[in-house]
A protein has these predicted regions:
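Short amphipathic alpha-helical segments
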Residues: 28-30, 102-105, 151-152
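Conserved beta-strand-loop-short alpha-helix elements that form
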Residues: 17-22, 63-72, 82-108, 123-129, ...
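Activation on terminal intrinsically disordered regulatory regions flanking enzyme cores
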Residues: 136-158
């Protein structure tokens, strides 16, 4: 089992992940992968044994080096990323990114659709291409925090 998770806190997202589930951020039309896969292929890319293109074409994409449930404990990679208004955060299982290219993900996230429609389109596209694995997709869009208008806010403004 793999995991990608996020917690919004103080104008930031705290991202955690294990395995090859991913987190992406779309900001002003640019998609950024926020996580690094815990996989044999990623390790081979990192040390220069294969290229990212060779990894994408490999039949060994699902050999993870870290997963939930294998050992009693597992190391969760955690990082903090800033959040701006209108940023979109995508959490997904490898069933999505194995079948849909990052450029296509960015195009769908940038489309003028509801978040639910974007999720449906991403899952649908992965399934159209064979959907060999389970496909989990969550999209969150950042908004401006509400203005504080209570009594304490009025006192603190003085």
């Amino acid at each position: 089992t793999t995991l990608a998770m996020a917690v919004a806190h103080g104008g930031k997202f705290v991202i955690g992940h294990v395995g090859d589930s991913r987190a992406y951020r779309l900001r002003e039309g640019v998609l950024e992968q926020l996580t690094r896969d815990h996989s044999l292929l990623q390790e081979q890319v990192d040390i220069g044994l294969i290229t990212p293109e060779e990894a994408a074409a490999s039949g060994n994409r699902n050999l993870v080096t870290r997963a939930l449930g294998v050992e009693d404990t597992v190391l969760l990679d955690v990082r903090e990323v800033d959040v701006l208004c209108d940023d979109q955060l995508l959490l997904c299982s490898d069933g999505l990114n194995d079948m849909v290219r990052d450029e296509e993900i960015a195009e769908i996230l940038a489309a003028d659709l509801t978040l639910d429609a974007k999720c449906q389109r991403l899952v649908g596209l992965a399934n159209e291409r064979g959907g060999r694995d389970n496909i989990s997709v969550v999209i969150v869009k950042a908004h401006e925090p509400p203005k504080k208008s209570g009594m304490m806010a009025k006192l603190l403004r003085k």
